[in-house]
Amino acid sequence: MINAWAQIEHTLRDNLNPGLFKVWIKPLAAEQAGDSLRLVAPNAFVASWVRDRLMNEIEKAAASVLGSVPTITVVSGEEPAAAPRPVQVPAQKRPAAARTSGAEQMGLPLHYASRSADSIKWMHSFDEFVVGPSNQMAFAASQDICQQSFRSDTLFLSSDPGLGKTHLLHAVGQQLCNISNRTLPRVEYLTAEEFATRLICALKAKEVDRFKARYRDVDVLLLEDVHFLQGKQRMQDEVLSTVKALQSRGAKVLFSSSFAPKDLNDLDSQLTSRFCSGLLAVIEKPTFETRKQILREKARLHHVQLPEQVADLLADNIRADVRQIESCLRNLLLKARLLNQQITMDMAWEIIGHYAKREAVLDIDAIVRQICSGFDISKEQLQSRSRRRELVIARNTAFFLARKHTDLSLEEIGKRFNRKHSTVIKGIANIEREMNKETPLGRQVVNAVNMVERNGRIIHP
């Protein structure tokens, strides 16, 4: 007999919008009372919202798993309840793994209890960050903001995707929680999109005051991907008010973005001013020596000593970003382990063949050509004013690749596609966001990017 709620969750994950699932279904825990299914929400607000808006979807999912619709109730975890018992289904129906405990479900909607250092899963630390000329300033600033002697209350980290912004924000959060003399350090970490989603939920539920209290009564606010706020005036107003309130109390605010403040458009001038009011640290692409050191450190974490020649080869050929460097290394280590062989230069060359080689360059013409081929559209359609969904996705993917692989400025990229540079920024932000989602569209975008990067490179003599 195995837990059925995980299988019901899996069905709901497939049927619901990813954001809806993450905010409202994922926090629920299941209990069995006879033939009834009891869902426990983190608080009364979530329980009420799920009852009013998602009960039909839950009943359909339960019926598809159990064969019939059980009696389903949704209650608040703040109410007294009997000891829970797992919901059971026959063992031949094998669901996905069960959800983690409530303590591990960070960032629940409008769950305002103070959070301890253990309630946020910090994935990275300063000790694991490889420092080089390209990121030295950002690393030092991130460390210093954890100290009382740091004179600024704001830090803005800017870089292309995959160069370490998230790593540093996690490291700051972990460090502050570790050195805090509080039992429950008040730290909030979320993306600008998550902030906006929770604000919308609070507005609909008339819980704005509680929302404000949550984010204005912290010691540190770590807000990622603030370029998402472009063109969203209501969200900008709330972020601005939150930042003002935090700074007036001496709290610290860290922002990250794929764009520098000067490149952000459709943004309130006061908010831009707040972004620029503290220290701005830009992370550039890592140098050869930094890339090599990253490879050594990551190999060490896997208890592998990387041969010097192999490290040189990988560092010299994989230059796009740190994520790609780490991915290449993981594939190399996995291949050696599966084949039960030593890591060799030949094996490394085979793995590099799936990534960008040093002499292979992806220029704007190749990007346009491959995008048109992959999306089955003409160059004229790609550069047209049409807002058809598939054309917008293709165009935004081209923006993303042009910024990643060429030296063209945002304005120059825009001119190539008859667009303003503000449109280019929004398009790139949308693609980055979709690539981080486990959705059909997200997978389509990732596949398109990989296809262009694999097929579109031209070899220079």
Swiss-Prot record:
Region described as Domain I, interacts with DnaA modulators: spans on this chain: 1-68
Pfam families: Bac_DnaA (PF00308), Bac_DnaA_C (PF08299), DnaA_N (PF11638)
Keyword Cytoplasm: yes
Keywords assigned: ATP-binding, Cytoplasm, DNA replication, DNA-binding, Lipid-binding, Nucleotide-binding
A Gene Ontology cellular-component term: plasma membrane
SUPFAM superfamilies, A to Z: P-loop containing nucleoside triphosphate hydrolases, TrpR-like
Positions of ATP binding: 162, 164-166
GO BP: DNA replication initiation; regulation of DNA replication
A GO molecular function held by the record: ATP binding
InterPro entries noted in UniProt: AAA+_ATPase, Chromosome_initiator_DnaA, Chromosome_initiator_DnaA-like, Chromosome_initiator_DnaA_CS, DnaA_C, DnaA_dom, DnaA_N_dom, DnaA_N_sf
Region (Domain III, AAA+ region): 119-336
Chain positions covered by the region annotation Domain II: 68-118
Region ranges (Domain IV, binds dsDNA): 337-461
Compartments it resides in: Cytoplasm
Main function: Plays an essential role in the initiation and regulation of chromosomal replication. ATP-DnaA binds to the origin of replication (oriC) to initiate formation of the DNA replication initiation complex once per cell cycle. Binds the DnaA box (a 9 base pair repeat at the origin) and separates the double-stranded (ds)DNA. Forms a right-handed helical filament on oriC DNA; dsDNA binds to the exterior of the filament while single-stranded (ss)DNA is stabiized in the filament's interior.
Subunit relationships: Oligomerizes as a right-handed, spiral filament on DNA at oriC.
Domain note: Domain I is involved in oligomerization and binding regulators, domain II is flexibile and of varying length in different bacteria, domain III forms the AAA+ region, while domain IV binds dsDNA.
Similarity comment: family membership: Belongs to the DnaA family.
HAMAP family named among the record's database cross-references: DnaA_bact
Protein name (Swiss-Prot/TrEMBL): Chromosomal replication initiator protein DnaA
The organism of origin for this protein: Oleidesulfovibrio alaskensis (strain ATCC BAA-1058 / DSM 17464 / G20) (Desulfovibrio alaskensis)
Gene from which this protein is expressed: dnaA
